[in-house]
Amino acid sequence: MISSDYIKDKILEIENIQGNLIRSRISEFKRLKKSDKYTLFKELSFCILTANTSAELGLKCQAYINDGFYRLDYNDLREELIKVHYRFYNKRASYIIGARDIIDDLEYIVNMDDHFRAREILIERVKGIGYKEASHFLRNVGVFDFAILDKHIIKFMKNNYYIKYENNSSRRRYLENEIVFNELAKKFNMEPGVFDLYIWYIETGKILK
C-alpha cells in the first residue's frame, strides 16, 4: 500500500501542474447544475454512453450529437452513434430514447437536498444507469458527494490494498468500495467527487469529466 504521505505529495504535485484545470472543471460542474433540463439531459446521455467505453469517446459523441440526444428518433440516433464509431449503438440509442421520460424532472433531481435519494431515483427510472453512471452524472452537475468508481479508480484501490477485489458490478460491492474511497478522501479533507479527479489523474494523466 502506498503511504498517505505519497498520496499527499502527488496531490500537491498535481495541484502545481493541473490545479487551474481542476478548479475550472469544478466550476464547470457547478454551472451545469444550474442548466435547463435539456442541457442536463445531454450530460445524462454522455454518462450513459461512457459506460464500458471511454470518457474520450463519450465526449466525442456528446459534441457530435448534441441536441440530437433529445430530438432524434431511435433510428437517426443509432445512425449518428455509428458515424462516431460508437460500439453499442443499438442498446445505448434505446437507453437514451427511454431516458427522455425523466427530462422534465432533471432540474428537480439535481437540486434535491438528499443526494443519495437523487441517485436512487436515477437508477430506478433510467435503464442503462447503475451506481457508477448515476454518480458520474451527479458529480458532473456539481454533487461532489460521489466519486466515479470506474476501472481506473478501482485499479488504484485494488493495487494499493484498499480493497480486495476489482469486481465492482453488484450494488453491495459498489457501495462497500464507495465507503472505502470516501474514507480515503476524508483523510485528505476532500469531497469524494473532487478527490476522484486527482486519483484519476494519478492513474491516467488526464483531467476529463
UniProtKB/Swiss-Prot annotation:
**Gene3D superfamilies hit by this protein:** Helix-hairpin-Helix base-excision DNA repair enzymes (C-terminal), Hypothetical protein, domain 2
Name the CDD domains on file.
ENDO3c (cd00056)
Q: Main role? A: Catalyzes the excision of an oxidatively damaged form of guanine (7,8-dihydro-8-oxoguanine = 8-oxoG) from DNA. Also cleaves the DNA backbone at apurinic/apyrimidinic sites (AP sites).
Q: Please give the family membership noted in the entry.
A: Belongs to the type-2 OGG1 family.
Q: Name one Pfam family in it.
A: Ogg-HhH
Q: Which UniProt keywords apply?
A: DNA damage, DNA repair, Glycosidase, Hydrolase, Lyase, Multifunctional enzyme
Q: Write down the EC number.
A: 3.2.2.-, 4.2.99.18
* SUPFAM superfamilies in the cross-refs: DNA-glycosylase (SSF48150)
List the active site.
K132, D150
Q: Which reactions fall under this protein's catalytic activity?
A: 2'-deoxyribonucleotide-(2'-deoxyribose 5'-phosphate)-2'-deoxyribonucleotide-DNA = a 3'-end 2'-deoxyribonucleotide-(2,3-dehydro-2,3-deoxyribose 5'-phosphate)-DNA + a 5'-end 5'-phospho-2'-deoxyribonucleoside-DNA + H(+)
Organism from which the protein derives: Picrophilus torridus (strain ATCC 700027 / DSM 9790 / JCM 10055 / NBRC 100828 / KAW 2/3)
GO biological process terms on file: base-excision repair
The UniProt entry, under InterPro entries, shows:
DNA_glyclase/AP_lyase_Ogg, DNA_glycosylase, HhH-GPD_domain, HhH_base_excis_C
Protein name per Swiss-Prot or TrEMBL: 8-oxoguanine DNA glycosylase/AP lyase
Give GO MF terms, alphabetically.
class I DNA-(apurinic or apyrimidinic site) endonuclease activity; hydrolase activity, hydrolyzing N-glycosyl compounds
The keyword Heme appears for this protein: no
Q: Where is this site: Important for guanine/8-oxoguanine distinction?
A: K209
At the top level, the lineage of the source is Archaea
